[in-house]
């Protein structure tokens, strides 16, 4: 379950962060929004073999040679994404072992698909939640799982490692992950 150096190596073609289209997270895992997920040229040029649509809003265009998986979850605090963490992480890993490439997407590529990505990195690359978030944010700066997904990711990290590297804290805007505390203070002081 540990990450090999080649999984994250820039020599494997990992590109600079992309905000609007595809963001390459590992050699075989990409994040995007719903529009990019239906762009045949982007899919082909990135050799995508499987697409996980973590939304109810986006309708995929089905292209030959690509496996499609639907995760019908809304981007709401009370949505149960946790139930999909293991099955989707296992799927991404299986596709990687077969030399395939997976695209995770939701509507914006910010919350649902990012949460599934973090779960995968924890499970199959033995990354803490904090490290998985830091890495993924370096590849796709716009990620920001909703607070309900954060709570589920924190529970998942504890299930995997019997430890937590991120915790929910009280703030003037309600409970937030502690990694956002500094950003919130800066916004409030403006």
Swiss-Prot record:
Class of this enzyme: hydrolase
Stretch list, region Sufficient for mitochondrial localization: 43-128
GO molecular function, one term: protein tyrosine phosphatase activity
EC number: 3.1.3.16, 3.1.3.48
Entries under InterPro entries matching the protein: Atypical_DUSP_subfamB (IPR020420), Dual-sp_phosphatase_cat-dom (IPR000340), Prot-tyrosine_phosphatase-like (IPR029021), Tyr_Pase_AS (IPR016130), Tyr_Pase_dom (IPR000387), TYR_PHOSPHATASE_DUAL_dom (IPR020422)
PROSITE patterns, per the entry: TYR_PHOSPHATASE_1, TYR_PHOSPHATASE_2, TYR_PHOSPHATASE_DUAL
Tissue: Expressed in testis.
Phosphoprotein listed as a keyword: no
Function, in words: Protein phosphatase component of the sperm flagellar doublet microtubules. May act as a regulator of sperm motility by mediating dephosphorylation of sperm doublet microtubule proteins. Can dephosphorylate single and diphosphorylated synthetic MAPK peptides, with preference for the phosphotyrosine and diphosphorylated forms over phosphothreonine.
Name the record gives this protein: Dual specificity protein phosphatase 21
Species annotation: Homo sapiens (Human)
């Amino acid at each position: 379950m540990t990450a090999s150096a080649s999984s994250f190596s820039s020599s494997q073609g990992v590109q600079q962060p992309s905000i609007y289209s595809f963001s390459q997270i590992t050699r075989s895992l990409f994040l995007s929004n719903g529009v990019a997920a239906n762009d045949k040229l982007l899919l082909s040029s990135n050799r995508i073999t499987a697409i996980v649509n973590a939304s109810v809003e986006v309708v995929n265009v089905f292209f030959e040679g690509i496996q499609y998986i639907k995760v019908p979850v809304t981007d709401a605090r009370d949505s149960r994404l946790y139930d999909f963490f293991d099955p989707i992480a296992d799927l991404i890993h299986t596709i990687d072992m077969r030399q395939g490439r997976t695209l995770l997407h939701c509507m914006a590529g910010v919350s649902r698909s990012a949460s599934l990505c973090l779960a995968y990195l924890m499970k199959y690359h033995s990354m803490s939640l904090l490290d998985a978030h830091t890495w993924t944010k370096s590849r796709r700066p716009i990620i920001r799982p909703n607070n309900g997904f954060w709570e589920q990711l924190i529970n998942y990290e504890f299930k995997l490692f019997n430890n937590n590297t991120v915790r929910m804290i009280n703030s003037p805007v309600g409970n937030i992950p502690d990694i956002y505390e500094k950003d919130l203070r800066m916004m409030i002081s403006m």
